Curated annotation (Swiss-Prot):
Keyword Cytoplasm found: yes
Catalytic activity field: dTTP + H2O = dTMP + diphosphate + H(+); UTP + H2O = UMP + diphosphate + H(+)
GO cellular component, one term: cytoplasm
Site-annotated residues for Important for substrate specificity: R15, T72, Q155
Keywords recorded for this protein, A-Z: Cytoplasm, Hydrolase, Nucleotide metabolism
Subcellular location, record wording: Cytoplasm
EC number from the UniProt entry: 3.6.1.9
Protein name listed in UniProt: dTTP/UTP pyrophosphatase
Organism (species): Hyphomonas neptunium (strain ATCC 15444)
GO molecular function, one term: UTP diphosphatase activity
């Protein structure tokens, strides 16, 4: 039935809005949530991404609406590379990722108007070329690393550093579209 309950995007990410638009979904409202994103002791990157997405969906004040939330974690082994705090940390992250494969895990959660929450974690493996100090410096100077897990955005200039991807490109950007659409439709969301 067209015109089901409204959809609220619990994220400030412009990339997530752009990705949703690619599949014809425009949220009725954007309402980012503020939760503690600290990793718990012994929590795997996958568990962290799922928990944060679920907590964001639960924390959104949107009674009677569908709520979509997501969180992306970049992991090198069991080490999380969060959003870089500054240029030095962004450069350090790129040095760590240089010439290596890492994982991007995006947790997606949808809360139905009934309060039921369903979620899924989507993992993609990304391999970067060996970066020169000049490439790292130029990328960091561009500012494109700001606000991005792992200190880079594959949809920008850093896409030129990636030699291989195994998994969902849209999960790396921040919202796996197939899984997101499936979760929404499974709970009865219709546009």
């Amino acid at each position: 039935m067209p015109g089901s309950a409204p959809l609220i995007l619990a994220s400030a990410s412009p990339r997530r809005l752009e990705l949703l638009a690619q599949i014809g979904i425009v949220p009725d409202r954007v309402a980012p949530t503020d939760i503690d994103e600290t990793r718990r002791k012994a929590e795997s990157p996958r568990e962290l991404a799922l928990r944060l997405a679920r907590e964001k969906a639960a924390a959104c004040d949107a009674e009677g609406a569908f709520v979509l939330a997501a969180d992306t974690v970049v992991a090198l082994g069991q080490r999380n590379l969060e959003k870089a705090a500054d240029e030095t940390e962004a450069a350090d992250f790129l040095r760590l990722l240089s010439g290596r494969a890492h994982q991007c895990i995006t947790g997606v959660a949808v809360r139905a108007p009934s309060g039921q929450i369903v979620s899924r974690a989507v993992l993609a493996r990304v391999k970067m070329k060996r970066l020169t100090e000049a490439e790292i410096a130029a990328y960091v100077a561009s500012g494109d690393w700001k606000g991005k897990a792992g200190g880079y955005g594959i949809q920008g200039a850093a896409g030129g550093f990636v030699t291989a991807i195994n998994g969902s490109y849209t999960a790396i950007v921040g919202l796996p579209l197939y899984e997101t659409k499936s979760l929404l439709e499974g709970l009865g969301y219709r546009r």
